């Protein structure tokens, strides 16, 4: 026995019931948003529309697009700063319904308001292809075309008439509207800026029939369901339940006969404006490549492109450029600067067909680009000064044009009265200045020869050394970060290509590591007790050792001596840095009972406010955090060394692993974390699936140990943050994958 035709799965029926509930809630929110919009509460309306979109059942693409367009309208009404949000909502609406002209028009209006007529023209041209009689699109297209022509960019429309009768009726309707001077209005249409109001007023004129919202016929609901581009037909085909809603709306508007003919005439009322452009072909575009150093970007330019147009295209592709020159390669492979539009046509003729033309962009100063066609000469200072004088030549401020410099009479009188009032002679000012400088230098010489001044000089010297060492330390951290540059690999590259890129990246990283090490060493030389430089130097040697080890395995070369030597240097620097910090911490604890020499000097100079003391608890937490992180980093170095020694067959790997576990314990790692690390050592694996350990488990253990100790002990010492929080470079994982692939 089969299932009856009308029988349905209970789960499906329940799902349909839920969809109906959510759909009803969504439409209620939509109506609330419409009421808020009519009250000019655009922010509240946008919030309601967004909630309505979230409650829409899946598959309601048309309603979702309509709501997204309404949200965009709300953003357009708020302020120009919200235009970017409006563009985003229009993009979402077009993703749901690609042929949605209202979203395209609103996005075009936003682009026009933001000063991007080129982007607005693309949307307007698309709408006019679908609807040649769209009045809003025509009005925006006129403004956008004017803006583009002012920039030297010629544009044309490729619009075809839909029907001769429609064109004739559109002409008659246009003449009628011109004669009667009667236009429908929209909510807030007179307050729009940068073409937004014209867009909305024209958009309402092409709607089918004069609908009323909340009993007022002069305000058009900006979220009405009828669309002139076939959106209503699509909605009727996807929603079977719209018939009931249509009946309700029909009953609400009973007694008013819809004027379908007028709707059709309004839709094509602007066809007569596009007759001059009917049949116009789209301008042929050429593909070009714009090369700016290592950055290559593709673009298109018209076949008969002028140099100002090309400079505009380059400026759009590279917005950060202030002044630049455009060059091309001639037959002798020489780079020739393009200064005229004729030279641009020569460069285009040299290009091979079916191959994009390559233009080389070079950034220069403003003086070098003078003389290039399309570049305006900046006015000189004398010209600006002369223009300022001309602007000031207005009424009481006017003066004889032959006198470049002048002083008003009231200025001279005021200066004389002021001198007499205060008894000050301006003629003696120069002598007073020289006398003051002489006394100042004599006082300084007398001061610096005293014994008290020597203590101040010592404190100043120490502070300047610390500042210089810290600057070198930060510069070294910059080079360490540069060494982590990720190699650019294709999705499915060849083995030879990978090796070439890896070799280049390895050389780059080694160079940056060497620069970073030199900076850290110079920092320690500048300030002998700068322990941060030794810790950073130890980590630099450690990262370089790991990179060399992975590179040796991937490329099958012998670098055993170099790797072990780098590990030795890393351990030595960590030990020196730890000892130096322990001595400094001991001296600090001993000096808690008496003030430091620096503090005594600053108190004598009444400058103690420039030194911020931390409490004993904060100092203890900071010391515990530094000790923990140094020991964990030291243990990591020893652990990685044991991995390398095990793979090389050296018996010392057990000793390195044992010392590493001790460092982890001192650093505050839990016994469970240490057991995970020991278990994942390559010596305990029966089958070596990876280079040294299972990445997932070890990363989880490190994360738990790092978070537990770091954030429990308080904030990390700010100077060592880039050292302790630095992750392994991507190149390490690529080399490991190459070795086992």
UniProtKB/Swiss-Prot annotation:
Record has Repeat as a keyword: yes
Biased composition (Basic residues): 248-258
A Pfam entry, by short name: PB1
Domain of life, source organism: Eukaryota
This protein's UniProt keywords: Chaperone, Repeat, TPR repeat
Region annotated Disordered, chain positions: 168-270
Biased composition (Polar residues): 201-218
TPR repeats: 26-59, 65-100, 102-134, 496-530, 532-557, 558-591, 628-663
Function of the protein: Acts as a co-chaperone for HSP90 and is required for proper folding of the myosin motor domain.
Self-association state and partner proteins as the record states: Interacts (via C-terminus) with O1. Interacts (via C-terminus) with OP10 (via N-terminus).
Protein name per Swiss-Prot or TrEMBL: HSP-interacting protein
């Amino acid at each position: 026995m089969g299932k009856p035709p009308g029988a349905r799965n209970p789960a499906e029926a329940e799902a349909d019931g839920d969809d109906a509930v959510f759909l009803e809630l969504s439409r209620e929110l939509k109506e609330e948003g419409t009421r808020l919009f009519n009250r000019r509460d655009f922010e509240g309306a946008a919030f309601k529309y967004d909630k309505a979109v979230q409650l829409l059942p899946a598959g309601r693409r048309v309603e979702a697009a309509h709501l997204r367009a309404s949200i965009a309208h709300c953003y357009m009404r708020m302020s120009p700063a919200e235009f970017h949000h409006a563009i985003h909502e229009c993009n979402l609406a077009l993703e749901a319904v690609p042929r949605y002209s209202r979203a395209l028009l609103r996005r075009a209006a936003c682009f026009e308001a933001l000063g991007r007529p080129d982007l607005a023209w693309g949307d307007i041209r698309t709408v006019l292809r679908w609807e040649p009689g769209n009045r809003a699109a025509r009005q925006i297209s006129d403004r956008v075309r004017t803006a583009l022509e002012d920039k030297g960019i010629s544009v044309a429309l490729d619009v075809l008439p839909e029907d001769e009768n429609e064109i004739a009726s559109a002409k008659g309707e246009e003449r009628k509207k011109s004669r009667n001077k009667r236009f429908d209005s929209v909510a807030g249409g007179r307050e729009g800026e940068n073409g937004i109001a014209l867009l909305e007023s024209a958009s309402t004129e092409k709607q089918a029939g004069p609908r009323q919202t909340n009993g007022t016929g002069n305000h058009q609901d900006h979220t009405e369901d009828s669309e002139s581009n076939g959106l209503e037909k699509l909605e009727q085909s996807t929603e079977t339940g719209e018939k009931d809603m249509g009946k309700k709306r029909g009953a609400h508007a009973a007694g008013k006969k819809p004027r379908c003919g007028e709707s059709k005439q309004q839709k094509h009322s602007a066809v007569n404006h596009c007759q001059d452009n009917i049949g116009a072909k789209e301008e042929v575009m050429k593909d070009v490549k714009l090369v700016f150093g290592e950055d290559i970007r593709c673009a298109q330019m018209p076949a008969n492109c002028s140099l100002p147009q090309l400079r505009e295209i380059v400026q759009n592709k590279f917005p950060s450029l202030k002044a630049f020159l455009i060059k091309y390669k001639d037959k002798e492979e020489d780079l020739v600067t393009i200064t005229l539009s004729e030279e641009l046509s020569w460069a285009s003729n040299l290009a091979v067909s079916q191959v994009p033309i390559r233009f080389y962009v070079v950034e220069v100063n403003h003086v070098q680009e003078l003389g290039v066609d399309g570049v305006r000469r900046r006015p000189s200072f004398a010209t600006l000064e002369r223009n300022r004088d001309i602007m000031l030549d207005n009424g009481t401020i006017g003066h004889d044009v032959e006198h470049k410099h002048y002083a008003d009479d009231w200025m001279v009188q005021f200066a004389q009265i002021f001198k007499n009032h205060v008894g000050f002679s301006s003629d003696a000012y120069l002598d007073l200045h020289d006398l003051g400088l002489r006394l100042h230098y004599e006082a300084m010489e007398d001061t610096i020869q005293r014994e008290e001044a020597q203590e101040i000089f010592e404190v100043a010297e120490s502070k300047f050394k610390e500042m210089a060492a810290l600057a070198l330390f930060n510069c070294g951290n910059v080079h360490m970060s540069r060494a982590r540059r990720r190699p650019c690999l294709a999705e499915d590259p060849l083995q030879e290509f990978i090796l070439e890129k890896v070799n280049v990246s390895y050389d780059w990283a080694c160079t940056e590591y060497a620069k970073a090490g030199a900076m850290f060493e110079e920092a320690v030389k500048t300030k002998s007790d700068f322990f941060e430089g030794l810790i950073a130097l130890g980590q630099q040697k450690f990262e370089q050792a790991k990179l060399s080890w992975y590179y040796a395995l991937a490329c099958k070369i012998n670098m055993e001596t170099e790797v072990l030597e780098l590990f030795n240097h890393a351990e030595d620097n960590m030990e020196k840095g730890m000892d130096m910090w322990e001595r400094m911490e001991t001296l600090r604890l001993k000096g808690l009972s008496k003030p430091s020499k620096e503090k005594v000097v600053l108190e004598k100079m009444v400058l103690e406010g420039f030194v911020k003391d931390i409490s004993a608890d904060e100092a203890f937490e900071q010391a515990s955090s530094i000790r923990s992180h140094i020991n964990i980093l030291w243990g990591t170095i020893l652990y990685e060394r044991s991995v390398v020694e095990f793979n090389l067959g050296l018996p010392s790997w057990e000793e390195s692993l044992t010392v590493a576990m001790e460092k982890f314990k001192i650093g505050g790692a839990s016994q469970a974390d240490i057991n995970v690390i020991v278990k994942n050592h390559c010596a305990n694996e029966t089958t070596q699936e990876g280079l040294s350990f299972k990445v997932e488990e070890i990363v989880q253990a490190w994360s738990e140990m790092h978070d537990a100790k770091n954030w429990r002990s308080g904030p990390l010492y700010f100077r060592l943050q880039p050292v302790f929080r630095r992750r392994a470079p991507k190149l390490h994982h690529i080399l490991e994958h190459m070795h086992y692939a």
